[in-house]
């Protein structure tokens, strides 16, 4: 399953290894990977925890669309997106995007594309819990 | 049948509920649905709208049985 949402903590490296082990050996020459991890600071404040809300159905659909578009733009062997939802803590992996292709150019470019499109279009919202227990919604993504 | 209206994240908190159900008026648009469902609040400037889980503009038509969602800019990843 190239798209997955994880209500519990997940290990992106285990997921990646397991997924790659099922791809035809020798078919791909490049694997590009991005893993996003929760920080314990944002906008100058200490962040204690975070909740990731999503729109069930629409989120999965748009992640699927993004992978379909990437495979039209580049010659890829496969790609993978995994994203955490629900309550998370600093140090927890939030997102994994991975791309397999014959050569590095397509792999690097498509992996970046998956991540940037996800940031722009996939319906997820972060609510941070600060050190003093106050909560606030993250209003926009960082520039990158 | 009716129109299902959904609100997410900070917008859900601002509206004070997650969902509304409206009778279809026959000439609805997404923006018109907001005005009928949340008459006491102007539609937010940076709102994103989805009709049946696809992004749409405020002037997009909405029909009986459609699901219209309103939410703030997305912040995943």
Where are these regions (language model features)?
Chain B
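Ubiquitin-like/PB1-type beta-grasp interaction modules and other compact soluble beta-rich domains
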Residues: 1-76
């Amino acid at each position: 399953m190239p798209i997955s949402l994880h209500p519990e903590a997940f290990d992106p490296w285990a997921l990646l290894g397991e997924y790659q082990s099922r791809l035809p050996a020798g078919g791909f020459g490049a694997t590009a990977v991005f893993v996003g991890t929760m920080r314990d600071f944002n906008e100058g404040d200490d962040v204690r925890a975070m909740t990731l809300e999503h729109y069930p159905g629409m989120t999965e659909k748009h992640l699927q669309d993004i992978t379909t578009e990437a495979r039209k733009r580049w010659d890829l062997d496969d790609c993978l997106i995994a994203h955490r939802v629900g309550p998370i803590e600093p140090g927890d992996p939030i997102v994994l995007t991975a791309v397999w292709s014959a050569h590095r150019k397509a792999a690097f470019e498509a992996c970046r594309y998956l991540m940037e499109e996800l940031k722009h279009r996939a319906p997820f919202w972060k609510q941070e819990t600060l050190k003093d227990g106050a909560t606030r919604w993250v209003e926009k993504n960082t520039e990158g | 049948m009716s129109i299902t209206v959904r609100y997410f994240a900070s917008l859900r908190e601002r509206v004070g509920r997650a969902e509304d159900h409206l009778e279809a008026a026959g000439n609805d648009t997404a923006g018109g649905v907001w005005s009928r469902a949340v008459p006491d609040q102007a539609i937010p400037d940076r709102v994103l709208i989805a009709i049946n889980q696809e992004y749409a503009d405020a002037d997009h038509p909405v029909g009986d049985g459609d699901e219209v969602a309103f939410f703030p800019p997305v912040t995943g990843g």
